[in-house]
Amino acid sequence: MKSIKWIIFFSIIINVETVMGNNDTKISYHISMPEPHTHYYELEMTVSNNRDRTVQLKMPVWTPGSYLVREFARHIPRVRAFAGTQQLKVDKIDKNTLEVRAGYYKEFTVMYRIYAYEQSVRTSYLSDSRGYLNGTSIFLYVADRKYEPGEVKVTPFRGWRKISTGLPKVKGKRNTFSFPDYDVLADSPFLIGNHDLLTFKVKGIPHEIALYGQGNVDKDQLKDDFKKIVQSTAEIFEDLPYDRYVFFILMLDGLGGGLEHLNSTTIQADRWIFSDDNRYQRFLSTVAHEYFHTWNVKRIRPIALGPFDYDKENYTDDLWISEGITSYYDNLLLLRSGIVDVEDYFKLVGRDITSVETAPGRLIQSAVESSFDTWIKNYRRNEESHNVMISYYSKGAVTGLMLDLAINASTNGRKSLDQVFQELNRRYENDPSTGFTSKEFRTVCENVAGRKLDDVWRYADTTDEVDYNSALEKVGCILERKYGEGVTSSTSYYGFATRGEKNPVVSRVYAGTPAYTGGLNVNDEIVAVNGTRVSTKTLIERLKDISIGDKAELLISREGLMQRVEMTASGPPYDSFVIKKTESPSKDQKQLFEGWLGTPWEK
């Protein structure tokens, strides 16, 4: 291949061998970042063994695992193509598709720059501190050649010495990595810079923690806890389905989130969480969540989620399974790992239950509907979303709890959701090309339970209230409902929240509450309560002074005009939920408890 010097544009090389039927590299990419302060990666994309006079190149519009059309092509300001020194015509035919007029050339090179300056797990980022690449937001692909193998060569910015990725290295080629097809390339992030590397092995398989940033992290403790999570998950599935695994951990200011990949995961965390037990537990829950996705999503998956269509939304009713039941397992794995005890585990589960029970949207939208609508609702929330939506994460986690308890009770503690995922994993291994349908998932669950589970499916399919205690009673537990801190049954309640350091401005109004029926709006500034001037600091106390059943007259500023809103104080709803053991469990309850959590009752 002839080299083409082009100072402005970064290089991705796609190199396709002309020899048919061999195992040589078909597609390769070279990527560099000579000016990271500009936040532009430079790519050179070389296509060999070309047979078409017109070649379509595409840029994905979304990232698998993050269900929103993000239009990554908008970050590419210009694309050029060359065959040797001959410039080829490039036409844009729709928002994410280019046509290269290749003529009779067997090989041509595409050059482009792409802007990357969003710190999230689902996009790419480049600055003078590091480079993070998420494949779908970086790499163009040849429309009809997604399933050809290739290589990626990375040229780091000067002084950057480390490249972490889940892709295997190519022997004899510096900073070069191979992939079997575009799907794997798109699902294999890169972290480039001078980050720390922590390593451990489970079942003889190497695991790497690529740790970026400074914070109050105890690296030895981090590595030990990650290893425990991997070990406890491996006990479910027995074998690890990869030759190597990478945890990308980005310690940043005030940021969070995680995204699963085929043999890696990216997790952002606030750099100062690691000395706070509660925040660190939540971080480890995220780690367990993303790692469990190695099976549940990346392999065991709804039929719509792979192979992917990168051009448009990929709809499924089953994200409550893929994300929600994974959310159930993330806390359970911390218990099995010995990272938390039963009491702390119950608090973590209580947090999921609280998320559901305090959301008015649970009465409007089912978990199945939430799954399907994620493309237009979950990532596009507004001030009304909590009133009309339920998260398939939290409602799915709660449904997973009820499903696990139902299987446990139906089999006298002998079986659980573990056996469901073991069977689904066996099916995947027999046919990796196809995901499950909703019916197939439910059939596997019912076969494991030995009965129909319509009493559980209604929690996914409808907005029926969850009867927690009917299931928890069988394992000697009860769901305890509480008021929040400083709240009693006689505390007046209105159903709105505010923001603002000095003057309270309404940020949320809950459906069916005094504030909602009284006509209070988001963005109303509250000036006075019953004739008394209030500030953010004094508002709550003035409202508490009003007895349940009495009226509160609020003087508000709405769009710069003063007006009055009247509402009647009501009693408070429960807003804290936690599972507790009963004091005198029966022998059968103890047996089912131990079958559920795998830990002795008395421990």
Predicted regions and their residues:
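C-terminal recognition in membrane/secretory proteostasis and scaffolding
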Residues: 330, 340-603
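Post-HExxH zinc-binding segment in Zn-dependent metallohydrolases
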Residues: 265-274, 299-300, 311-362, 555, ...
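Bacterial N-terminal signal peptides
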Residues: 5-17
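Non-catalytic architectural context of zinc metalloproteases
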Residues: 69-78, 82-242, 255
